[in-house]
């Protein structure tokens, strides 16, 4: 399959002897995760996405479990531990002009208005107040609030972000 996929969940440890697995959403909420149509799976150590044949997805309190078709015991289910669940990028909702998917920020190079480099975005921390870009350059890590007052420009096609931020903030 040549289409781009977006990771929406990761499979965790087996949950029951009948082959159920823990499912960890990477989406903002369990409801968002469950709203996507067809899911695809990428097994550990492969780059191949295959359509997922799920038997059921169960939501219990704040946990989600998945039962894959034709997987009826924990031993067989173990090969799916750490697999990724994804959807085709085209399945995601269109964003407004000033919105981005956080996953598109990962890997962007970050420089300030003085052309000082903060490295690349390796993670995004979600806090109650705002999101924070985690940038790494060599052995240094920088935390930059992802708010309009500090973001001068973003070019996601070129994977470049310019910020109004200094090393000593």
Curated annotation (Swiss-Prot):
Residues 97-169 form the PRC barrel domain. It is found in: Cytoplasm. It holds the Pfam family RimM. Keywords: Chaperone, Cytoplasm, Ribosome biogenesis, rRNA processing. The keyword Cytoplasm applies. One of its GO terms (cellular component) is ribosome. GO terms for biological process: ribosomal small subunit biogenesis; rRNA processing. One of its GO terms (molecular function) is ribosome binding. The keyword rRNA processing applies. Belongs to the RimM family. Binds ribosomal protein uS19. An accessory protein needed during the final step in the assembly of 30S ribosomal subunit, possibly for assembly of the head region. Essential for efficient processing of 16S rRNA. May be needed both before and after RbfA during the maturation of 16S rRNA. It has affinity for free ribosomal 30S subunits but not for 70S ribosomes. The PRC barrel domain binds ribosomal protein uS19. This is Ribosome maturation factor RimM.
